[in-house]
UniProtKB/Swiss-Prot annotation:
It holds the Pfam family NadA. This is Quinolinate synthase. The gene is nadA. Its cofactor is [4Fe-4S] cluster. It comes from Mycolicibacterium gilvum (strain PYR-GCK) (Mycobacterium gilvum (strain PYR-GCK)). HAMAP family: NadA_type2.
Amino acid sequence: MTVLAGTFDAALADRVVDGPGGFSGVDGDAAWADEVRRLLKLRGATLLAHNYQLPEIQDVADHVGDSLALSRIAAEVPEDTIVFAGVHFMAETAKILSPEKTVLIPDQRAGCSLADSITADELRAWKAEHPGAVVVSYVNTTAAVKAETDICCTSSNAVEVVASIPADREVLFCPDQFLGAHVRRITGRTNLHVWAGECHVHAGINGDELADQARAHPDAELYVHPECGCATSALYLAGEGAFPEDRVKILSTGGMLDAARETGARQVLVATEVGMLHQLRRAAPDVDFRAVNDRASCRYMKMITPAAMLRCLVEGADEVHVDPDMAAKARLSVQRMIEIGQPGGGE
């Protein structure tokens, strides 16, 4: 895309510094927010921000949500340019569902440990070991992996997707081992093979921390993302009577927001990336939301800084490209998921 020469705040843009950890040098203050909104209008662009983004990025966005919901919004909005504040696979998914639109990500180096835990070559080799198996991939995967997938799923509909597959068919579930274990536990399916991938942030929220927080806040509700390694611990605590079963909820990010709007609890413990707390507090300002692990911050999500956003809008970078043939195959796996049932609260 073209640079918006002469139409931006040069003094602000000149502060942007690139370094190993990403772009810095600009604060997400009111002047920055005004400039972002002005540049979005000049570019005819809409800004989509994931739930795990920095609060100032979420607050300036046109839409905030999970990756699949945002990608579907990208396909529906009238703007021809989409700025996706998230990690790279999310921007890829937006491009897959909106191939005719220009998709920008403020820093293309913002990767994902979960998406990177399986490659297309590894998936093809796994498929060769299980001929005839149905491949179910979490939407948190690259375009190349989606292109090798039969049906995509989100954390909110993974059980429904797997249950739709004939019981005598083997299922290869990738890449998240904890979501896969959750699906196997709920469906009781013995022919479900699970890839040993994980999100480094969710895997780092451990059962001991969860148990300590539950004991310290016995009247709280507990929202646990199924990518968490501690999801099994949460169910164990409930089963042992250490925590009331009706207060333990295994939820996608969208499911957490729905539950927050309806909860009668005064306090909620949240086991997911800490950026989610911003949206939860906006949804239910009278509830005390606390992170089970306040260090559970995704360094890749946080690479989308105010400086990165400003540089993106000034320079029209970084543009996301997906090979058309790969995108067409990947799009089919997402469409099959939608045909089975609405993806609901996404990842």
